[in-house]
């Protein structure tokens, strides 16, 4: 029996911290599906298609990773339909855990067969958040140590595009 997990997130952009959590999940599960949440409530820098392209590029070396988009609906329903036994969540700090713990309880209520697995990234990524990466990059800071080169190119292009508009 294949042990499958889903790893949901906005991934705006996908960072080395996300990649680290994914690699840790692959040590536990046979297959991990990265699920991009469209999340209309969040203001994103990149479109869903741009984020999908970046994640595909970063994970293409892994034969046991797939990528999909959750356009609408409940994550618990998506997990059930995908045949996943677990939802992987990266937790960098206590405040992440508090929110994720509440969500895991709700998901367990909706889909008792699924387990939420909390994974901590390598300590060098504990302060790396997509929000910080976006802000630093858009201000011209060097984020090359925190994202894949393909993602860095996309961030630089987005910054150049914004600078051209002002």
UniProtKB/Swiss-Prot annotation:
Name listed for the protein in its UniProt record? Phosphopantetheine adenylyltransferase
Fill in the subunit field for this protein: Homohexamer.
Where substrate binds, per the record, is at: 10, 42, 75, 89
A GO MF annotation of the entry reads: ATP binding
Q: Name one GO biological process term.
A: coenzyme A biosynthetic process
Write down the EC number: 2.7.7.3
Compartments where located = Cytoplasm
What cofactors are annotated for this protein?
Answer: Mg(2+)
Function as written in the Swiss-Prot or TrEMBL entry? Reversibly transfers an adenylyl group from ATP to 4'-phosphopantetheine, yielding dephospho-CoA (dPCoA) and pyrophosphate.
Quote the gene name from the UniProt entry.
coaD
UniProt keyword annotations, A-Z: ATP-binding, Coenzyme A biosynthesis, Cytoplasm, Magnesium, Nucleotide-binding, Nucleotidyltransferase, Transferase
Task: Report the InterPro entries cross-referenced here.
Answer: Cyt_trans-like (IPR004821), PPAT (IPR001980), Rossmann-like_a/b/a_fold (IPR014729)
- What's in the GO CC field? cytoplasm
Q: Where is this site: Transition state stabilizer?
A: 18
Q: Which residues bind ATP?
A: 10-11, 18, 90-92, 100, 125-131
Record-stated family:
Belongs to the bacterial CoaD family.
What lineage does UniProt assign to this protein's organism? Bacteria, Pseudomonadati, Chlorobiota, Chlorobiia, Chlorobiales
């Amino acid at each position: 029996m294949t042990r499958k997990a889903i790893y949901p997130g906005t991934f705006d952009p996908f960072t080395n911290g996300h990649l680290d959590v994914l690699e840790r999940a692959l040590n536990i599960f046979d297959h991990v599906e990265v699920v991009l949440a469209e999340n209309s409530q969040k203001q994103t820098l990149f479109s869903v298609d741009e984020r999908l392209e970046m994640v595909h590029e970063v994970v293409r070396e892994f034969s046991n990773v797939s990528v999909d988009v959750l356009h609408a609906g409940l994550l618990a329903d998506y997990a059930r339909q995908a045949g996943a036994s677990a939802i992987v969540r990266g937790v960098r700090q206590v405040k992440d855990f508090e929110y994720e713990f509440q969500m895991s309880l709700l998901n367990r209520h909706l889909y008792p067969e699924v387990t939420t697995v909390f994974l901590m990234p390598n300590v060098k990524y504990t302060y790396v958040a997509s929000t910080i990466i976006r802000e630093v990059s858009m201000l011209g800071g060097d984020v090359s140590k925190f994202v894949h080169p393909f993602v860095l190119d996309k961030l630089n292009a987005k910054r150049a595009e914004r600078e051209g508009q002002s």
